[in-house]
C-alpha cells in the first residue's frame, strides 16, 4: 500500500512499465486546465494556472473589471452594450 501522502487524488498516477516487465506507479501533480472566457470560451491571457498560492492577488489575474472571467474583446462588447441601453 502506498504511503498516506500518495493516497491523495490530488496527485495523478502514471503507470510505468519497468525493464523487468513489472508495472510501477509514478505520482506527479495534476496540471490545471487553462481558464477560459465565460462568453466565447477562448483561453484567457494573463491568468496563471498552477501554484497560485505562490503569487499575490494582483499577479493571479488582470486588474480590470471581470478580469479572469471575461476576455478583453468580450468585455469591450459588454461595456458597449451596457452604455447603449
UniProtKB/Swiss-Prot annotation:
GO cellular component: ribonucleoprotein complex; ribosome
Pfam families found in the cross-reference section: Ribosomal_L34e (PF01199)
Keywords: Ribonucleoprotein, Ribosomal protein
GO biological process: translation
MF terms in GO: structural constituent of ribosome
Superkingdom, taxonomy of origin: Archaea
InterPro entries, per database record: Ribosomal_eL34, Ribosomal_eL34_C_sf, Ribosomal_eL34_CS, Ribosomal_L34e_arc-type
Repeat recorded as keyword: no
Family: Belongs to the eukaryotic ribosomal protein eL34 family.
HAMAP family with a match to the protein in the record: Ribosomal_eL34
Protein name as catalogued: Large ribosomal subunit protein eL34
Organism of this sequence: Saccharolobus islandicus (strain M.14.25 / Kamchatka #1)
Phylogenetic placement of the source organism: Archaea, Thermoproteota, Thermoprotei, Sulfolobales, Sulfolobaceae
Amino acid at each position: 500500500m502506498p504511503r498516506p501522502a500518495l493516497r491523495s487524488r490530488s496527485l495523478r498516477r502514471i503507470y510505468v512499465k519497468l525493464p523487468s516487465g513489472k508495472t510501477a506507479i509514478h505520482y506527479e501533480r495534476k496540471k490545471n486546465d487553462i481558464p477560459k472566457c465565460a462568453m466565447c470560451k477562448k483561453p484567457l491571457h494573463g491568468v496563471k494556472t498552477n501554484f497560485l498560492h505562490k503569487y499575490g492577488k494582483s499577479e493571479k489575474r488582470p486588474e480590470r473589471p471581470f478580469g479572469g472571467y471575461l476576455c478583453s474583446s468580450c468585455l469591450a462588447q459588454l461595456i458597449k452594450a451596457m452604455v447603449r441601453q
